[in-house]
Amino acid sequence: MSGHSKWATTKHKKAVIDAKRGKLFAKLIKNIEVAARMGGVDIEGNPTLYDAIQKAKKQSVPNKNIDSAVKRGGGLEAGGADYETIMYEGYGPNGVAVLIECLTDNRNRAASDVRVAMTRNGGSMADPGSVSYLFNRKGVVIVPKGELAEDDVLGAVLDAGAEEVNDLGESFEVLSEATDLVAVRTALQEAGIDYESADANFVPTMQVELDEEGARKIFRLIDALEDSDDVQNVFANFDVSDEIMEKVDA
């Protein structure tokens, strides 16, 4: 099991009840605005926008905020910012490779925030390409387990291009090529299977096994990075056991 995948789903669940709720909402709204700007406001022809809206709704972002973000992105309402996507690369404690995906209207601010978070939490910046080769862009769909068995999920998505289904404890992770993400998500919907999120993420090709101390260090680093308004996603190639995850979550 990918420690980062399990951490991400746990973090995702906790984020709506902690002090970072407003920050999470702002990042979800930003995703919607950019998706509308890049692909248009019609969700039927813009699956990225559809997924961004669904993700926001599942986190209880108010509909009026979602509608305004779509309109700003589509140029139908004033106030939209000129965001750009920037990827930063680095290494965390214990040699963990880290990719930081920023969505920002201020490149200098984003670079400064990332560098400060890295250097203050045992990390270091790396040259472009020195870390990204350790990851592949994949479609990642998270499915709440509920009463589902792994075979139920696998049977629904296999013909849609899914490559594997991983058990994350309270949920299943469905991996596919990024180009098959919409097909996999649609197959789940047609099978009546609810999903928590559907994203094109960077998935590591190899992982660093961490002990409890190492896990706490990398979690502190990722928390510091995600505290920046400009950081949308953090991907890292670590793995931890279920026992260590329980200790860290305690």
Swiss-Prot record:
Membrane-crossing segments per the record: none
**SUPFAM superfamilies, per the entry:** YebC-like
Q: Name its GO BP terms in alphabetical order.
A: regulation of DNA-templated transcription
Keywords, A to Z? Cytoplasm, DNA-binding, Transcription, Transcription regulation
Q: Where in the cell is it found?
A: Cytoplasm
- What Gene3D superfamilies is this protein classified in? 1.10.10.200, 3.30.70.980
As for family, the record states:
Belongs to the TACO1 family.
For this entry, the protein name equals Probable transcriptional regulatory protein SCO1521
